[in-house]
Amino acid sequence: MSGLAALEAEVRRDLVRLNHPPANWPLGIPAADGTPVLDVLVVGGGMFGQTAGFALIRDGIRNIRVIDRARRGEEGPWGTYARMPTLRSPKHLTGPDLGIPSLTFRAWWEAQHGAEGWERLYKIHRLDWLAYLLWVRDAAARATGRVFHSVDPVVDFGRFRGRRIAVLGANASAFDNAGTALEAGAAKVTMFARRAFLPQVNKTRGMVFSGFLRGFGRLDDATRWRFLTYTAGEASPPPHESVLRCERHPGFRLVFNARWRDVAADAEGVTVTTAEGPQRFDAVIFGTGFTVDPARMPELAAFRDAMQLWGDRVAPEEAARYPELARAPYLGEGFELTPRDPASLLAGALARLRLLGPAAASSHGILSGDIPAVGTGCTTLAREIGQALFAEEVGRHYDAVVAFEEPELAPTPYFVPPEQRLRRG
């Protein structure tokens, strides 16, 4: 046996040695009509979702489901809308393995390419990372839910061959889309940036250590807001590999100080107007990033007015100055939504809803949105959920302790049956 087969045998041995999976300990609370319900539903089966499921099972919380609207292999961005050739993160970082050496990317890579192959590897290819995540899921036997779904639209970049493309924005995803269009044969790609120059330093790289990962969510509001507003003004640069990917194409042009004054589409293409005047393109790619706004999440519509946002925690002028941060949900230490009014009828329901992802970044920092933090974030989430489940069922656990009867001295001459113990004491 060699290669991945040997590694998978090692994984099985490691998990057995770790007593995985442990027995399920939550007692479960049935629905009002008596039907059983899940202890945890994880919505999203990408990197964080599957790792959260694994962390819950590792903690003995097994009555769970992990669901995703995508088909297998299309969860998350890796095989769908991500365009970068390689990950931003260094190859040595861990996370989805939850501290099990045989489940690390390095173990998976070396099983196929040897130690020399690991030394030759510069950074992890995006699709290799996807293949690794799927392997981890299967090797750890932790696929805990069926996947349902229609995928995010996949752009056919082949349509851009010979075309003129405008890209609005100069962040990492903008460069990745520009590079993909150029490699697909686009004749000309013009990128427009509002800034006078590209950001130079990725400040979040200075936050990747255990103290920050574990401690940020427990800081007071003022200190967290200070970090948040500083990093909001210090945009992250695109990786140098993404920039060079575009620069090697003669049809690429990056224009600074170029705010769009107007954009108009017609049957023949798109007209973009800047201070330089109107320019014609065949298509436009918006690389402007994403926003976190609970008001636009239909699944949270019933809780929209009851949930607390960061804008409720800071001075009105601060909220007005940083509207993106102010819109973010204000989460508790266990990633749970918190109520504006603790006496609200929805307060209890909000405590059962936990957000692990970009929406949690304002409350928990990079613990909720990056490869280096996935292991810490998911184990923290599992621990907090376990504490909440235990507290909710503590009365029944007390009764179970009282009823627990596993006589240690039964094989000895000093064994006393329960009924005699009661009479004597």
Residue ranges of predicted features:
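Conserved N-terminal glycine-rich FAD pyrophosphate-binding loop of Rossmann-like flavoproteins
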Residues: 70-98, 199-215
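Dinucleotide-binding Rossmann-like beta1-alpha1 core, especially the glycine-rich loop
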Residues: 82-98, 109-137
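Flavin (primarily FAD) cofactor-binding/catalytic cores of flavoenzymes
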Residues: 1-70, 118, 122-184, 188-425
